[in-house]
A protein has these predicted regions:
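Flavin (FAD/FMN)-binding glycine-rich loop and adjacent Rossmann-like elements that form
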Residues: 1-198
Length: 198
């Protein structure tokens, strides 16, 4: 298991991050190379220092595993304040992977660039901040936002308009026909109320 050695046994939440290790943006070739070299050296040091008889089998990934790099500045930005908040222009319903009862309606505006006409971004490249970005970056939300962006782009072509001007109810109907949940319903909300899940 690579995560046993990765970054000095760093966790998903940044615990055990190696002391004095800088943050990496992952936005330049030099930065990615520096990240890879330092990470491999950290892993090799960990292997050298450990008892060889107590090691797990390990595989070293062939790609950098950077979580946060660049993302768009959207027409809307998903934040933690949006948990359990209905969004009129929602294109999918996602949940927090750490707290599956915490639901977010993802507005189309989070996928639409504020600065570049007809540019859509999904998953970790969509517009979100803070912990809401962590919720949006994982694979299931990336799939759902990708499906929504594809449907929005196709509809914009059909309607001969900018993607930010598509008919939202029509887009939602298209996505619902593809079995995408768009809005929260009472049966999806926690029985003990939303307060304990925020």
């Amino acid at each position: 298991l690579y995560t046993t050695f990765s970054g000095g046994r760093a966790t998903l939440y940044g615990h055990n991050h190696p002391a004095n290790m800088r943050r990496f943006s992952g936005t330049t070739g030099e930065d990615v190379t520096d990240y890879l070299v330092r990470n491999q050296l950290e892993m090799l040091k960990s292997l050298k220092d450990d008892d060889p008889r107590s090691r797990d089998i390990t595989a070293i990934p062939t790609m950098p595993q950077l979580r946060t790099t660049r993302h768009i500045r959207g027409v809307r930005t998903l934040t933690t304040a949006d948990v359990f908040r209905p969004a009129e222009d929602s294109v999918c319903l996602i949940n927090d992977f750490d707290n599956r009862d915490s639901l977010y309606e993802v507005p189309l505006g989070c996928l639409v660039s504020e600065d570049a006409d007809n540019l859509l971004a999904v998953g970790r490249a969509a517009s979100a901040e803070g912990y809401a970005w962590d919720v949006l970056r994982v694979i299931p939300p990336a799939i759902l936002t990708g499906q929504a962006a594809g449907a929005a782009a196709a509809q914009a072509i059909d309607e001969k308009c900018s993607v930010r001007d598509v008919n939202i109810p029509k887009l939602q109907k298209t996505l619902e026909a593809q079995n995408v949940l768009i809005h929260m319903t009472p049966d999806l909300l926690p029985k003990d109320g939303a307060e304990g899940h925020i």
